[in-house]
Amino acid sequence: MSLFLPKNPLEVSERVLREKIQSADFLLSDEKCSHRLVGLRYDPSRMKGPEVAVVCARHEMALAKQIALSLGKKMYVRPEFSAVLFREYYCGERLAPKDYAAAAELYALFYRNREGTFPRA
């Protein structure tokens, strides 16, 4: 049995982080963009509600911001909501109904600025 071990483990973590950030519709951060970064994704045709695409903490922030900027991801400064998401959810977990209103507000802003149209379920 062959086990693939990368020469540089950081390459793997950077690739995984890039894939997770790329899968997010947009990102939320604290006011200084230095403590936490949380990404949300939602596809109404196949999901019951928004889910957390990526969660980054302090030690990943520099790389995560660099990746997000290179991908052209929209970042919103929402300290309270990003703290709730960071504290209560894991990557890949669907949001609880109690957080739908805050997420819907951000999605409305995101789609209004993006295309002026909303996705249909």
Report residues per predicted region:
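Divalent-cation
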Residues: 1-121
